[in-house]
């Protein structure tokens, strides 16, 4: 019996060959069925196909092979070869199974693991010598229990003066895997510290239920507003990416002790500033790369060590000398004095600091050449340098009083000597004035220290110090954002905006840098929950831009944007000082259309314009010496003055400015008004507009003065 072509084609692969062979052989032992009718089939040409392994016996054969279909006469030989190969494969499989069954599973040798595939936890940072006992378990807890990655420990105890965080700072950094991991880990860390008697403050932490509440409120607000939420990149108050856990100062002593000078005499009493401040910075990976706090604090530490190396631990002789050719204090801008205790401003949301120490402070006697006599005129004038050093280290009131005296001393110097006082020495070390200033602000409360630093920056800018430019202001802004200036008043932030735009820039790139720095300051205001689009901010930017001169297209575009806010933005009513400053700067640059637009701001808020504002307008119009402008101003403003509620009374200063405007509008009005006799009515003279105004003003000035 011969195989049909269909059977031969079905036995193309090795498995099909074996199955077809069994069917072919078994056909001899069974009765033959009647053959079906013969059908003509068209043989297709030889094709290529892939073989596969359907049974374990063929595991040793190649996975994929390409074959060409052989001719019909070669098929019987192929079938015999396939049967022989299958028998060999089955025999080898059975042999391997029998051999493997003899070895129990616990004696089978596993394949060796490559050393690089074994996971080893990263080493923990080394604990600095002299650290508190809490540091080692804290580092292990943050690494093992919280699962923070990339731990880094910075020893900042060598920074002099110490930062606002506290003395002897040790800062631990860790990276969280996600925002949720960050908040959960910080919450566990605070609870772990609380169990050990440490009350830590975690800035940026959302509690266990607070996050759910904020998300629920955000979704409800988005539903009510018909929006999907805040735009991308906006601060939603939920995604922080950074939590600062401040453990406070470990080992702080609140016991008062007696201080003695080098002669063994009692110099005072106070609480010593001791202990170590521990701060744990937990951040997400992207936030950590963005802030780069390690780089910032490492740079601060390096610069502090460089200064200490230059000083070599010894203060040189002071160079405080007064010269007879001192310039007046009006030569450069005098900033607002430093204050230390709270008191309300004109607006309830503005606070400032004041102290009674200012009333008792005397002028600094700068005729000596050492640190102790630089404090002469104070109650500690006979103390030794070590006594002064101890007092400045412990007594906050003494530091504030010293800052007041240094302020007065700087204003008493000629401009060139004042510039040298706020500069570095030839060897790169700070001057005696700057060294004493740094010592005075050391360990002061954050608000007082920043007020003192901003005062010094403003004084240096007024002196046109070359090192106090935009780069210096940018460094201060970054330090404020990272070290914290939460207690600083709003007025100081506005002063910072004035300092930024008070630097004249002649290129568009410089103006864009100013705009970028101003946005950083505005962002800090926004993070405090204060309104940023307000008249004090807008007026500060407009005034500074106009006074420095608008020299570039970018500066003109920026000025136009802020001027548009005066009439379009929904802001609170400005103060009297803000309106007067805008009137001054627009009158100085002869921008009269904008001048009158500012004059009409108060009526838009239904507010009464004051006597001081009317006086300023009349003075500015009189200074121009233009008849048409003086005539229009008198016709508009005098009539509006009578219709204010209550009416504005004429003060002596206002009367003087009005007389000057009348002389410009009608030069003969004054002489005609004086020549009119009370007994004789001259209708020709009385009908003149400004003659009647002159007589009316002099009649009302008596009761309005």
UniProtKB/Swiss-Prot annotation:
Region spans: Disordered: 83-102, 330-349
Keyword annotations from UniProtKB, A to Z: Membrane, Mitochondrion, Mitochondrion inner membrane, Transit peptide
A GO biological-process term: mRNA stabilization
Family matches, as InterPro entries: Atp25 (IPR040152), NT_sf (IPR043519)
Membership in a protein family: Belongs to the ATP25 family.
Biological role: Probable mitochondrial mRNA stabilization factor.
Protein name: ATPase synthesis protein 25, mitochondrial
Organism per entry: Sordaria macrospora (strain ATCC MYA-333 / DSM 997 / K(L3346) / K-hell)
